[in-house]
């Protein structure tokens, strides 16, 4: 894992209206090439969902954990889940399809539970999955992200509206997206690193430029805020 502790993720879902599977794979491979050759902050992570205990009772089913490289994070799905994570002093993985307000509430539950169990979480850093779509035309950026997600959200019967989900991710021009990402980090007490997904962007050259620029700006942001 790189010292900057950022990464990318891919949504493992395909629908006919989006694009051919071969193009989806080609775009994903291009993302990996950019990471390898042109940037320095991104980790490539593999998701493996397990459970925090070996017994599969109702409580542990609420607390799936996800391996990100060599690190283990608890998927922040409910107050019960994050209380369980706090008891073990394990970091959280915040979902891209939750509202920012829900993420903040879950973090508050986590911190309160850690205090209750007398667990030191001062050095714990969480992760937040975010979709990023940058376009000089913000309407186009949001439209591309909406098209990319709409069938997945319909299939999973998401409780949150697609407009709220888009507003809880990052779609717009570059400066707006970067500011929004920083705001979300601050809302979570600067205790989160990010997993970005750029795959909703149709323009591959624009995606490459974005990833390289994000690379530079995120490194500077972390240095300015002593997040090494």
Curated annotation (Swiss-Prot):
Molecular functions (GO terms): alkanal monooxygenase (FMN-linked) activity
Gene name for this UniProt entry: luxF
One family name in Pfam for this protein: Bac_luciferase
Organism name: Photobacterium leiognathi
Subunit annotation: Homodimer.
Domain of life, per lineage: Bacteria
Coiled-coil annotated spans: none
Family: Belongs to the bacterial luciferase oxidoreductase family.
The UniProt record lists the keyword Flavoprotein: yes
Keywords of this entry: Flavoprotein
InterPro entries per the UniProt record, alphabetical: Bacterial_luciferase_CS, Luciferase-like_dom, Luciferase-like_sf, Luciferase_bac/NFP
S-S bridge residues: none
Cofactor: FMN
Descriptive protein name: Non-fluorescent flavoprotein
Cofactor note: Binds 2 FMN per subunit. Each FMN has a myristate attached. This flavin-fatty acid linkage is probably the result of an enzyme-catalyzed reaction, most likely the bioluminescence reaction itself.
């Amino acid at each position: 894992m790189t010292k900057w502790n950022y990464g990318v993720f891919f949504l493992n879902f395909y629908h006919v209206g989006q694009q051919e599977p071969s193009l989806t794979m080609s775009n994903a491979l291009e993302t990996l090439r950019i990471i390898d050759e042109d940037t320095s902050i991104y980790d490539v992570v593999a998701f493996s969902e397990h459970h925090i205990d070996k017994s599969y009772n109702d409580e542990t089913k609420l607390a799936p954990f996800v391996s990100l490289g060599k690190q283990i994070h608890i998927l922040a799905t409910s107050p019960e889940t994050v209380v369980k994570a706090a008891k073990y002093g394990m970091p959280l993985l915040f979902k891209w399809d939750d509202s920012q307000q829900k993420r903040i509430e879950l973090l508050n539950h986590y911190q309160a539970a850690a205090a209750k169990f007398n667990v030191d979480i001062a050095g714990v850093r969480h992760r937040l999955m975010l979709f990023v779509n940058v376009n000089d035309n913000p309407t186009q950026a949001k439209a591309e992200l909406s098209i990319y997600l709409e069938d997945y959200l319909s299939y999973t019967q998401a409780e949150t509206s697609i407009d709220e989900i888009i507003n809880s991710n990052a779609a717009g021009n570059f400066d707006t997206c970067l500011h929004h990402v920083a705001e979300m980090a601050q809302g979570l007490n600067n205790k989160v690193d990010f997993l970005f997904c750029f795959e909703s962007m149709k323009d591959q050259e624009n995606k490459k430029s974005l990833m390289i620029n994000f690379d530079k700006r995120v490194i500077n942001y972390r240095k300015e805020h002593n997040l090494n």
